[in-house]
């Protein structure tokens, strides 16, 4: 497993995230509708909207997964925020970043991943 690097804009990114005051807030229908729609549109069992804090990935909304947060070290989203576009992992077992990641080897046993960084 390769832990995600820290993006060059980390200080500004974290400041913008905290300014939103969204971390650790209760579920909201407006976000849940987005994740449910994504699950249906892409025909995938799991969809979530995650925010990457300094040491964790926190799921604001999710469907098909009971996870509320994970360490940033094992997060797929930690890798996604390193770029500006869509990140696709077609088979996590064959990707050097993820093949031995506990999110891949243990439940939820992620195989396919597609993510896009959120920007404020």
Segments the model singles out, each with a brief description of its role:
Residues 118-120:
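Sensor-regulatory modules in signal-transduction proteins
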Residues 1-29:
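Signal-transmission linkers at sensory-effector interfaces
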Residues 24-57:
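Helix-loop-beta substructure at the N-terminus of cytosolic sensory domains
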Residues 15-16, 45-46, 52-62, 67-114:
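Regulatory sensory and allosteric helical modules in signal-transduction proteins
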Residues 2-3, 26-30, 37-39, 66-68, ...:
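A short linear-motif detector with a strong N-terminal bias
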């Amino acid at each position: 497993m390769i832990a995600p690097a820290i993006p060059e804009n980390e200080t500004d990114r974290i400041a913008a995230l905290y300014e939103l005051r969204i971390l650790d807030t209760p579920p909201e229908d407006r976000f849940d509708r987005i994740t449910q729609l994504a699950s249906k549109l892409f025909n995938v069992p799991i969809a979530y909207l995650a925010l990457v804090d300094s040491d964790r990935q926190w799921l604001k909304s999710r469907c098909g997964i009971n996870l509320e947060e994970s360490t940033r070290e094992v997060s797929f989203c930690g890798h996604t925020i390193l770029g500006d576009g869509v990140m696709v992992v077609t088979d996590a077992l064959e990707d050097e970043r993820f093949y031995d990641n506990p999110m891949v080897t243990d439940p939820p046993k992620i195989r396919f991943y597609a993510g896009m960084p959120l920007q404020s």
